[in-house]
Design a protein with these regions (language model features):
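Conserved active-site segments centered on acidic
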Residues: 3-101, 171-180
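Hydrophobic structural packing positions in well-ordered secondary structure
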Residues: 32, 80, 106-107, 161
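Phosphate-binding/catalytic loops
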Residues: 104, 110-185
């Protein structure tokens, strides 16, 4: 085998290895303080954006316990419905197991991220970061719209979350790249 063919085979094996690792289910958890506005909205947006939901797991949870067992806030549901999205999510609180189960745990603001880092076990495997870091407009903090009057804050939140989810998928949606690389061979 020539060195050129050997190099080509190694590259092909490398692509196949990357594809194999990205073909496993990627798990994402969105977190906000109460799991009634931002995180269930992000969950609904991401689920809508994913072409092959069977290779992804998406959920949302709260840092605090006061909304556990309740559906998302009325205004959140209204904005989702305006965009043709639905949510049957019921609020839950972050658990220790989440830090091992999920690959990415996204906080909506710096306080969420600080709380998550404080809650995370020392050997946690999840990557904790701000969802807004993926926003194409560099609007890193997704503010809590709960205390705002009307729907404006929820609309702003929806736009930020949508841009951020699209940005995340552009970077981490490796399965599409794998399929494209396989087709090119």
């Amino acid at each position: 085998m020539s060195s050129k063919n050997r190099s080509r085979q190694i590259v092909k094996l490398g692509v196949n290895k990357m594809c194999a690792t990205t073909e496993r289910k990627l798990r994402i958890l969105f977190v906000c303080i109460g799991n009634s506005c931002r995180s269930p909205m992000a969950e609904a947006v991401m689920k809508n954006l994913l072409p092959g939901a069977s290779t992804w797991e998406v959920d949302s949870a709260a840092i605090a316990s006061w909304n556990v067992g309740l559906p998302p806030e009325e205004r959140c549901l209204r904005i989702l419905q305006e965009h043709g999205l639905d949510s049957n999510h019921i609020a839950r609180q972050v658990t220790k197991a989440d830090f091992y189960r999920f690959d990415f745990i996204f906080g909506m603001d710096p306080r969420n991220v600080e709380d998550l880092q404080r809650m995370a076990p020392a050997d946690a495997t999840a990557k904790i970061e701000l969802l807004g870091r993926y926003d194409s407009e560099r609007d890193n903090v997704i503010l809590d719209p709960y205390f705002e009057t009307g729907d404006h804050g929820f609309r702003r939140c929806f736009e930020q979350i949508s841009r951020s989810c699209v940005g995340f998928l552009r970077i981490h949606g490796a399965t599409r790249r794998c399929h494209a690389a396989a087709a090119a061979d």
